[in-house]
């Protein structure tokens, strides 16, 4: 939508979007998943995210209109992503039998779908003042004494059972 495309986003819980985009976006229409059976319009590109099964009515519209059907998978750095990105996934049964979905794997390497980012991200990064941000948001909340150098860790993961123990162990090791 940021690039000028119209987007219809079908969701089962639109409350989940409130914190991400409380004001919405003029090019994004949010629709209830439960209403998908009643739609008569389908986009030129349909993105099925994370293996969610589309209603038969929607699959039929995709096949009838000839929409590009993308099967969006999770971001991964695993080696199979390079082998699987862009492969056809033939529909074997149902309303779109014989039609192809196309695997799309976001990833970090050339040969994957890459990473989508805001159009102004590089400009914002180049003007970001890390020291000012740290002084404003991190250091006032810190209990470390001024002589110790903090250990900065970026952690991106699902929340495993051992995460709390890991964080506590890190905190006690200072």
PLM features: what roles do these ranges have?
Residues 51, 58, 62, 109, ...:
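Generic secondary-structure transition motif, activating predominantly at the C-termini of alpha-helices
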């Amino acid at each position: 939508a940021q690039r000028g495309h119209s987007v219809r986003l079908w969701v089962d819980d639109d409350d989940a979007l409130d914190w991400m985009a409380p004001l919405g976006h003029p090019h994004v229409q949010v629709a209830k998943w439960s209403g998908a059976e009643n739609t008569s319009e389908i986009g030129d590109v349909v993105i099925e995210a994370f293996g969610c099964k589309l209603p038969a009515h929607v699959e039929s519209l995709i096949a009838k209109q000839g929409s590009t059907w993308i099967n969006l998978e999770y971001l991964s750095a695993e080696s199979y992503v390079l082998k699987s990105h862009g492969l056809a996934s033939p529909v074997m049964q149902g309303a779109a039998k014989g039609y192809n979905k196309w695997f799309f794997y976001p990833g970090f390497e050339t040969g994957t779908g890459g990473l989508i980012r805001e159009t102004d991200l590089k400009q914002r990064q180049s003007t970001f003042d890390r020291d000012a941000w740290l002084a404003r948001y991190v250091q006032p909340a810190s209990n470390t004494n001024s002589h110790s150098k903090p250990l900065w860790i970026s952690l991106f993961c699902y929340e495993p059972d051992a995460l709390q123990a890991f964080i506590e162990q890190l905190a006690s090791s200072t």
